[in-house]
Amino acid sequence: MEELALDQPAIVFWMHHPGELTRFDRLEDAVHSVMLEPSAKLFAVAWIKARDRHIEMEEIRRIQRLSILASHLS
Protein backbone atom coordinates (compact mmCIF):
# COMPACT_ATOMS: atom_id res chain seq x y z
CA MET A 1 0.00 0.00 0.00
CA GLU A 2 1.43 3.36 -1.01
CA GLU A 3 1.93 6.09 1.58
CA LEU A 4 -0.69 8.85 1.61
CA ALA A 5 0.24 12.52 1.59
CA LEU A 6 -1.44 13.99 4.67
CA ASP A 7 -1.45 17.51 3.21
CA GLN A 8 -3.80 16.70 0.30
CA PRO A 9 -7.45 17.87 0.23
CA ALA A 10 -10.06 15.40 1.44
CA ILE A 11 -13.83 15.03 1.77
CA VAL A 12 -15.46 13.17 4.68
CA PHE A 13 -18.72 11.36 3.97
CA TRP A 14 -20.58 10.82 7.26
CA MET A 15 -22.53 7.55 7.57
CA HIS A 16 -24.74 8.62 10.48
CA HIS A 17 -26.12 11.53 8.40
CA PRO A 18 -26.50 10.24 4.81
CA GLY A 19 -25.71 12.93 2.29
CA GLU A 20 -23.71 15.02 4.78
CA LEU A 21 -20.12 15.73 3.88
CA THR A 22 -17.32 17.93 5.13
CA ARG A 23 -14.44 19.27 3.03
CA PHE A 24 -10.94 19.63 4.45
CA ASP A 25 -7.80 21.22 3.04
CA ARG A 26 -5.69 18.48 4.65
CA LEU A 27 -6.27 14.73 4.88
CA GLU A 28 -4.74 14.76 8.37
CA ASP A 29 -7.46 17.19 9.56
CA ALA A 30 -10.16 15.01 8.00
CA VAL A 31 -8.86 11.91 9.79
CA HIS A 32 -8.68 13.80 13.09
CA SER A 33 -12.26 15.04 12.66
CA VAL A 34 -13.56 11.53 12.02
CA MET A 35 -11.71 10.13 15.03
CA LEU A 36 -13.26 12.79 17.31
CA GLU A 37 -16.60 10.99 16.89
CA PRO A 38 -17.24 9.05 20.13
CA SER A 39 -17.97 5.74 18.37
CA ALA A 40 -15.19 6.00 15.74
CA LYS A 41 -12.95 3.49 17.51
CA LEU A 42 -15.62 0.78 17.35
CA PHE A 43 -17.86 1.52 14.37
CA ALA A 44 -17.64 2.81 10.83
CA VAL A 45 -18.85 6.41 11.15
CA ALA A 46 -17.45 7.83 7.91
CA TRP A 47 -15.29 7.27 4.87
CA ILE A 48 -12.92 9.70 3.19
CA LYS A 49 -12.31 10.55 -0.45
CA ALA A 50 -8.77 11.82 -1.02
CA ARG A 51 -7.73 12.60 -4.60
CA ASP A 52 -8.35 9.29 -6.37
CA ARG A 53 -8.55 7.13 -3.25
CA HIS A 54 -11.45 5.89 -1.11
CA ILE A 55 -10.38 5.47 2.54
CA GLU A 56 -12.44 3.20 4.81
CA MET A 57 -12.59 3.33 8.64
CA GLU A 58 -9.90 0.70 9.19
CA GLU A 59 -7.41 2.75 7.21
CA ILE A 60 -8.61 6.00 8.84
CA ARG A 61 -7.81 4.47 12.25
CA ARG A 62 -4.38 3.34 10.98
CA ILE A 63 -3.57 6.82 9.66
CA GLN A 64 -4.59 8.34 13.01
CA ARG A 65 -2.35 5.92 14.95
CA LEU A 66 0.62 6.67 12.67
CA SER A 67 -0.01 10.41 12.95
CA ILE A 68 -0.05 10.23 16.76
CA LEU A 69 3.11 8.13 16.78
CA ALA A 70 4.90 10.54 14.44
CA SER A 71 3.95 13.54 16.58
CA HIS A 72 5.31 11.84 19.71
CA LEU A 73 8.58 10.97 18.00
CA SER A 74 9.20 14.47 16.67
Task: Show where each model-derived region lies.
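Residue-level signal for functionally critical sites in structured catalytic/ligand-binding pockets
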Residues: 12, 36-37, 45
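Short aromatic-glycine-(Arg/Gly/Cys) micro-motifs in beta-strand/loop hairpins
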Residues: 1-19, 48-51, 62-63
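A short, charged, amphipathic alpha-helix used as a generic interaction element across diverse proteins
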Residues: 25-40
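Low-complexity, intrinsically disordered short peptide segments enriched in small/polar/basic residues
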Residues: 9, 28-31, 57-60
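A broad, structure-centric signal for solvent-exposed, well-ordered loop/edge residues
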Residues: 19, 31-34, 55
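A short, exposed loop/beta-hairpin motif centered on an aromatic-Gly-Thr core
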Residues: 18-26
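Short, mixed-charge low-complexity intrinsically disordered segments
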Residues: 40-74
